[in-house]
Amino acid sequence: MGFLLVLLVVPEMGFADSRPDMVVKKIRETSLAILQKAYQNERAFVRAAAARAAGESQDLELIPLLNKATEDVYPTARLFALQGLQKVSRSDALTAARRMTDDTDIWVRSAAVEILGDEGGPEVVVEVRAFLKSYDVPMRMAASSGLVKHGEEKYLEDVLDPLTHPIPDRRYQAIGYLGKIGTQEVLPHLAKLFDHAEPEMVFYSLKAVEGKTTAEMLPKLRELIKRDNASVRYAAALAMGNLREAEPDLIPLCADKDGMVKLSAALALNRMGSSSCQIVFEELLKHPDFGVRSAAARVLGETKIDDRVRLLKMALEDNHSRVRTAAVRAVGMMGGPEAFPILVKLLEDSLEVVRAYAAGNLIHLLR
């Protein structure tokens, strides 16, 4: 696939006199060097980006970098590295996960238990069950969730119990695990939370059912898109994305006063195959809030519209690093011949994080 891509774009990239196989080799070597250099950066967020980009490459040659990053002093870098190994090598991910169940950071520890359950076969059940005795609620939830996925449904109650935990983060994490379990048995518990008094609980429950909503949920979703709370409105709009009958409800939200609600409505419509509201993506790339612009850039990676390449190039010219970072990852997600020359050009970008993500995605395209 990578060789075919180069054949298509070599003339455009200024390599007309070069053999395609040599071009592939040069781009790959340059990309690997960029990732290695980025991981040496003193700034933690750059190292974290390098680890995430290495995972996105899905390339075996970057396993040593990812293993090294699992021992980084920055928890986010360790987490991204572990998640990256999951994309590259099941055996390496399991080895790292077993070690990282003792990590100093609770979020990394619980992610390690979750990955142990997700990537392991029946042989990990005994290991995962041991974490049911952990003093950390997130560890116990990760273990219980993993066991439910392995068919031990009696542990579902251990994931449901934290929904009433006094610490909000524990409640939200429980909702997240229920969403990942995602079975028909779990959905009614999540739908029940649509009536919760706390907007945050409603928001997270809506996020958890995204892609799994049923027609029975539609009446309540129609109520929620009219709430004053913008976060609830935008999560409810996204939750409608797999219900084609919700199209008439979503179209008016494309004119909502909140940028994220508009974006969610346009994205939900796109996911259901509707061509309505496509102009919203370009509008929001000009929004005064960089958070909205970065979100708009990010979803273009999955949004198949005719003008996508032009819009991504627009986002890559943004003056905020978050927007440009989201845009380069979206270009990689888009993939194909159109992405290739854009990513090659970004190997010389002024921002190291942009160069790192371009490198990771190019390595993936060249596989």
Model-derived features: positions:
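Short inter-helical turns and helix N-cap capping residues of alpha-solenoid HEAT/ARM repeat scaffolds
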Residues: 42-43, 73-74, 104-105, 135-136, ...
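Core register positions within helices of long alpha-helical scaffolds
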Residues: 53, 84-87, 115, 146, ...
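N-terminal leader/linker segments that initiate helical-solenoid repeat arrays
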Residues: 13-56, 76
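Solenoidal tandem-repeat scaffolds enriched in leucines and small polar residues
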Residues: 136-211, 231, 238
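A generic tandem-repeat structural signature
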Residues: 75-154, 168-172
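Amphipathic alpha-helical scaffolding segments comprising HEAT/armadillo-like alpha-solenoid repeats
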Residues: 27-38, 59-71, 90-102, 121-133, ...
